[in-house]
Curated annotation (Swiss-Prot):
Catalyzes the interconversion of L-ribulose 5-phosphate (LRu5P) and D-xylulose 5-phosphate (D-Xu5P) via a retroaldol/aldol mechanism (carbon-carbon bond cleavage analogous to a class II aldolase reaction). May be involved in the utilization of 2,3-diketo-L-gulonate. Pfam families: Aldolase_II (PF00596). PANTHER family: FUCULOSE PHOSPHATE ALDOLASE, L-RIBULOSE-5-PHOSPHATE 4-EPIMERASE SGBE. The gene is sgbE. Binds 1 zinc ion per subunit. Belongs to the aldolase class II family. AraD/FucA subfamily. This is L-ribulose-5-phosphate 4-epimerase SgbE. Its EC number is 5.1.3.4. It comes from Escherichia coli (strain K12).
Amino acid sequence: MLEQLKADVLAANLALPAHHLVTFTWGNVSAVDETRQWMVIKPSGVEYDVMTADDMVVVEIASGKVVEGSKKPSSDTPTHLALYRRYAEIGGIVHTHSRHATIWSQAGLDLPAWGTTHADYFYGAIPCTRQMTAEEINGEYEYQTGEVIIETFEERGRSPAQIPAVLVHSHGPFAWGKNAADAVHNAVVLEECAYMGLFSRQLAPQLPAMQNELLDKHYLRKHGANAYYGQ
């Protein structure tokens, strides 16, 4: 069942240590099939160097039930499911504790758009969620993590298609894309922007966001209706 998608999700998960986004097993990647009926996700707590495509777990999106796989799915499965159910434009999701993005998450800070590297991928600041309540933490924690991400985008009027990443307060980053590989790509860029942003703020503590005109130019030339970047 979904053998190609399992292979794709395995490859995306293996890309996390290759890009230095994870330590030990601190991360996961998932993707949905074309019908958006099924999600394939990394198994919980399995080391990357022994993981195979057969270890990937198939979960029904509507019910959250495991329909194929001998291992337990990632503990973050309910977060992934919440995002897939809410946003049809998301086809793949990555969660990591990558060092510099997690620094911003732990500080509870949005990552401003300070330069064109950021603007090429994210149409504005990458938001950090609010702190979760005690009830949310002690209840269905992973599901509520997804809900607080959705709340952040909806209350701020942000588009998850235009800003394909979020920082979860005191936790770490999630990134997404049209498929698993695209989500990993965005997670790599997020980590690089977080790294550059940390030093930019140290050098210039009052640094304002980049010019709106420059943000528009770089984002829209790649992603706008009249995009002209690339082949």
